[in-house]
Regions:
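Active-site/ligand-binding-proximal alpha/beta "capping" segment
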Residues: 123-158, 165, 216-222
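Serine residues within intrinsically disordered or low-complexity segments
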Residues: 9-10, 18
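Arginine/glycine-rich "motif VI" loop of SF2 helicases in the C-terminal RecA-like domain
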Residues: 88, 154-162, 188-190
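A cross-family phosphate/adenosyl-ligand binding-site feature
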Residues: 25-131, 169-204, 209, 215-226
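Short hydrophobic alpha-helical segments enriched in small aliphatic residues
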Residues: 4-7
Length: 226
């Protein structure tokens, strides 16, 4: 996957040569040095391969060791619970953001550091983004995919400017990444939009990328449309 990512990066550099405004702006961008909180999107399913749970446990532990607070959807099972529990066991902090109706259904993790309840799903997602210095996405179902694509769209529009890392465990996100590359190839997206996200193959790589991805810039919204 690293070789594939390098090819995409080379393709990106080649294709945007004519976008002088974009290149001028990107050289001025700074990288995050002090990351205090990371939003983690992931599955609530308990019936998935253990490799996903191992990655979730390791990610929670790594973030806690770096004193990075985790912001998540407060799930009491699946990868959400795995990330939260491993972070707490390592001395970390976890803030849950969850709508009232999910609390009423008993879907919330009750042992987290901080609880924030919202009225709607949209309010929940907006608050999670506002509170975070970056996003890491582990594999998940429709909810996770919706959250990931929405935050990528917000970054494309200059609303969310911070790092987005896709943690591609077991090649789970490879079909999605190929679809996004196809969207670029067929002019549904611009070539430079490939830099809206980065791909990691391990929790260690995902955390490392947080500190190496340039912050996006609101000026890039001029490139949002084809």
């Amino acid at each position: 996957m690293k070789d594939e990512r390098h090819k995409v990066s080379s393709f990106f550099i080649f294709c945007i040569g004519s976008y002088k405004g974009f290149l001028t702006t990107i050289t001025k961008i700074k990288k995050l040095e002090n990351i205090k909180s990371v939003c983690v999107y992931c599955a609530s399913s308990t019936k998935i391969d253990k490799a996903y749970f191992e990655a979730a446990n390791q990610l929670g532990k790594l973030l806690a060791e770096k004193n990075i607070r985790i912001i998540n959807g407060a799930g009491c099972q699946g990868l959400m619970a795995a990330v939260s529990n491993s972070a707490l066991e390592a001395g970390g902090k976890v803030t849950r953001v969850i709508p009232h109706f999910m609390v009423e259904q008993g879907w919330n993790h009750t042992g987290l550091t901080q609880t924030i309840e919202t009225e709607t799903m949209h309010e929940r997602k907006n608050l999670m983004a506002e509170m975070s210095d970056a996003v890491i996405t582990l594999p998940g179902g429709c909810g996770t995919l919706e959250e990931l694509l929405e935050i990528i769209t917000w970054k494309q529009l200059g609303i969310y400017l911070k790092p987005i890392v896709i943690l591609n465990i077991n090649g789970y996100f490879t079909p999605l990444l190929e679809m996004l590359e196809k969207a670029i190839a067929q002019n549904f997206m611009r070539p430079e939009h490939v830099k809206l996200w980065e791909v990691a193959n391990s929790p260690e790589e995902a955390v490392h990328l947080l500190y190496s991805i340039p912050l996006w810039n609101k000026e890039f919204r001029k490139f949002a449309a084809i």
